[in-house]
Amino acid sequence: MNYPFRDAALAFARGQTDAYALRDFLIGQQMNYPKPLYYSLMNLLGSHDVDRIRTALCTGVNIRSLSREEQVRLSFTDAQLAAAVETEKLCALLQFAIPGVPSIYYGDEQGMCGVCDPFNRQPFKEGVRELHDFYARLAAKRRGADALSTGEAVFMAASADVLMVLRYINGDKDALGERARPGAYLAVINRGAHSAGFTADCTAAGCGMFSGCIAAHSGRIFELSKEGQRE
């Protein structure tokens, strides 16, 4: 269970660290795990052991450090809850863009809230349909592209706010040496309050340099080719 990934993603999303630190963390995991283990990591944002991701994104407070009574008294405004949904999308895009297994704790895809055990174990209920649909689109895109699941990975930062993840398969073998469909994708995440330009070195995927602009507080996955690109 890749809790270090959760901690790093949360720190970036909350503005406690920057894209350079997150890039270095992702490279560190890539370098320190054998490939079969690395591509099997359970990349999670929530579980029964921690506060739910939407709740965590509503505050910079370490909820696990609070007493049970203090946790029960926590409350958030509608604006905080709405902003947390948008930030969760950025975390989810990263979760689905990196090597490993994107693991969703039940209800997180619906925007369920909850502090620590037992308050994070409430019965499942439907909530934010838009968030559910966003997760469904991420899952469909990853399922339809071998490069996004078992392709090679390159991590880059365009600025303190913009993280980039290049995933690719050259030829007919993936990163584990198994037969796979070739392809190249670039995930770009901008946590900043303003749109940002970026340039990514995609030469490892045979796609040269790729430049673009990403809207404020948003993420996109570009499909790359040697001739051009499309989202």
Residue ranges and their predicted role:
Residues 78-83, 123-129:
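Short, contiguous acidic/charged loop-to-helix segments that flank catalytic cores in large enzymes
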Residues 130, 156-201:
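Carbohydrate-binding surface patches
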Residues 201-210:
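Solvent-exposed beta-hairpin/edge-strand motifs
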Residues 1-117, 187-196:
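Conserved alpha/beta catalytic core and glycan-binding cleft of carbohydrate-active enzymes
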Residues 39, 86-89, 132-136, 182, ...:
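Feature representing long, continuous alpha-helical segments
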